[in-house]
Amino acid sequence: MSRSAAEFLKPQNVASTHYLDNRVYWDHEIFEEEKKRIFSKVWKFVCHVSEIPSTFDYRTIKVADTPLVVIRGKDEKVRTFVNACSHRGIQIVRRPRGNAKTMECIFHRWNYDSTNGELTGAPRKEAYGPSNFDLKQCGLREVRTETYLGLVFVNLDDSAVSLSEFIGDALEMEKDILGAEELEVFDYYEQVLDTNWKNWQETNLDLYHEFMHFANRKTGLTVKEYYQRAWKLYPNGHAAIERYRAQYSNYAGWQDRDDGIRLPGLHPNEFQLVNLFPDLAINARGTVIRIDSQTPISPGKTLVQYRGLGLKRDSERERVQRVRDYTSIWGPFGTNLAEDTLATSLHAKTIQTGSVPFTYLTRDEGGMTQDDLGLRTFYREWERLMSRQANQIR
């Protein structure tokens, strides 16, 4: 039965944890608070160690609007610095990736050591003496950086807990995949989506939406074991789903895949998914790993970065096969990823206008596969950090 305006604007009589006020997706005040209370306070994934393999290799990124450069020093330690000159705040490193023995500001040619961030040179520096300006105190700001299972994380909050305490046991089911052999990123793709960052993260927490995916309907939803997996919840908003073996032979082309290149710890048909709050998702499937991470741009615009990982020791033939396995499903023109990007953009077309007041997280299957438990866990942590309820913004 259809509803009147009054009925439509009133939430159903469900628990407060089971629905959202949709202003969490489009309210500018909420978005600014998220940057301060979440992205400036928690550990944020920035890259895989294989992306900066050599001394002085770097990558640039933004976290909570703060420009950062992640760089491997001459001591082989990975560090992160705020990518801004201590003099006038000019952005120093301008390329998304590269190699720099020193980092030089183009404005006044101030130079910084790429290992420790120390200011190593400034033209005509004697003129700073009369003003009592101490150039020794002009090093770059270093940001906390830690690595776990090849994943590089940063934290803008110097008083935050350690990375290991933040992650806890959330990657326990991924250790044999991520840590058994040396991996490397073989595919990198990014796109700006017209959607809120939480909408994209939800695609990796909401397994009920797999009815949308043609490939999933053919290979997963036909398997009894698919529905018998339990969600595993961890502190700090992390969630993972137990593994299962899909019937990939039902999907045209899978029979041509080489099981000999499967990842350590995975059966050729096995699938594993882990979500680390707030924005990291690790999908492992037989022969490939996909890592999703995000940079929120505005309430309705998000930069999503996708990384494909495989074994570094691959032969040329094995790498060609692994790339094919990855791109056919998870590449920009693959059967799966494009469907998710379409869904999130269609969601934004109504949510961002304020046309729909509520989102419901009401599926309850005893914590099994298509339960909304993962979503509710995410928003419970969101509420804790934001100090507000997600179902009642004002």
Swiss-Prot record:
UniProt cofactor note: Binds 1 [2Fe-2S] cluster per subunit. Binds 1 Fe cation per subunit.
Superkingdom: Bacteria
Annotated InterPro entries: Rieske_2Fe-2S, Rieske_2Fe-2S_sf, Ring-hydroxy_dOase_2Fe2S_BS, Ring_hydroxy_dOase_asu_C_dom, Rng_hydr_dOase-A
Pfam (any one): Rieske
Binding site for Fe cation: 209, 213
Gene induction: Part of the abs operon that is induced during growth with 2-aminobenzenesulfonate (ABS) as carbon source.
Catalytic reactions on record: 2-aminobenzenesulfonate + NADH + O2 + 2 H(+) = 2,3-dihydroxybenzenesulfonate + NH4(+) + NAD(+)
Regulation: Inhibited by o-phenanthroline.
rRNA-binding found in the keyword field: no
Temperature dependence: Optimum temperature is 35 degrees Celsius.
Residues reported in the UniProt entry to bind [2Fe-2S] cluster: 85, 87, 105, 108
GO molecular function: 2 iron, 2 sulfur cluster binding; 2-aminobenzenesulfonate 2,3-dioxygenase activity; iron ion binding
Cofactor(s), by name: [2Fe-2S] cluster; Fe cation
UniProt-listed Enzyme Commission number(s): 1.14.12.14
pH and activity: Optimum pH is 7.5.
Tagged with keyword NAD: yes
Keywords: 2Fe-2S, Dioxygenase, Iron, Iron-sulfur, Metal-binding, NAD, Oxidoreductase, Plasmid
Domain annotation Rieske: ranges: 43-154
Record note on quaternary structure: Heterotetramer with a alpha2beta2 structure.
Protein function: Alpha subunit of the oxygenase component of the 2-aminobenzenesulfonate 2,3-dioxygenase system (deaminating) (ABSDOS). Can use 2-aminobenzenesulfonate (ABS), benzenesulfonate (BS), 4-toluenesulfonate (TS), 2-nitrobenzenesulfonate, 3- and 4-aminobenzenesulfonates, 4-chloro- and 4-hydroxybenzenesulfonates and pyridine-3-sulfonate as substrates. No desulfonation of ABS to aminocatechol or aminophenol detected.
Protein name in the entry: 2-aminobenzenesulfonate 2,3-dioxygenase subunit alpha
Organism of provenance: Alcaligenes sp
